[in-house]
Amino acid sequence: MRGSRIALVALAALGLAAAAPAGGTGAPDPPSVVLVTRDCASLDVVCPAYARAARRTGTRARIVSPDPREDITATFALLARQGHDLVIGDPALAPQLADAAAQNPQARFAVIDMPLALGSPRPPNVAIIEVRPRDAAYLAGWLAGRMERLRRGPDAVGAVGGYPIPPVDEFIVPFRAGALRATHGARVITGYSRSFTDPTACKVLAERQVAQGAGVLLDAAGGCGPGTLDVARRAGIWAVGVDRDRSGLGPHILTSVVKRYDRAFALLMRQARNDKLPAGRGMVVGLRQGGVELGRISPRVPGRVLRELAAVRRDVVAGRIKVPGAPPG
């Protein structure tokens, strides 16, 4: 793994050094798990969640961030030969992980937060876990539409995505469906900035949606998204964030579609400990499994709306409401 930099600074900052219990107690050795990711700075939700899961499950955990110039497949293969109970990769590294898995059939691998449809076919020693936001995104859309009904004027909500790809549309498609259900036919304005990194691209698109009457904006564009959220703040309208709880940004945040990566990682770590990893198969963790949820809801939302939202949530969890997802990409 020459050239790989094990993210020691990140390990210390995330508290991973204390994740594993001390040996010599007679207890079984804790499982050893390693996460291979491009950069914890760009995955600043995933890496802290990994650390929390390691502490919660008593797992010996490492993070490896390979140099982009090196052979990533070789990095995965070397980690597999080192005897880790589980080697996890982020979706961007899935092709290299699959190659290494085919070369090391005795090792166990997993890809975190990858749509199952994109991970087939897969080697028999690779598990895919999809943190599926669609049910929580539907609830966020319903809440957006319901609050829009309280605003004077025509009902309209907007959604700014990065690219028209399944991981983005898993937010936008159910958000749209929820808004339509709450408003019985609001105008839903969607668009794609064609960027995950340029806030200006999202700002331009969000301003266009506000000019078309949108009273709520969904941000589903990664690092481009702050442009959308700032437009909502300046326009005095609601915004809905994704991935993490964005309520700390200000009173314009209606709610957020929060991915609980810590619970997904904890599930994988426990399965590795108990030798029950669903290798060769995929798992979905969504609203019902606690893998996603709505973040803090604005205190300005009326109590009657919260009660209605709770009823919709029960219907979604029970399967009485069929929530659409992204079309196959």
Where is each model-derived feature located?
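N-terminal Sec signal peptide cleavage junction
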Residues: A19-P21
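A residue-level marker of the well-folded mature domains of exported/periplasmic proteins
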Residues: G23-G329
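Bacterial N-terminal signal peptides
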Residues: A7-A17
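Positively charged n-region of N-terminal signal peptides that target proteins for export
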Residues: M1-R5
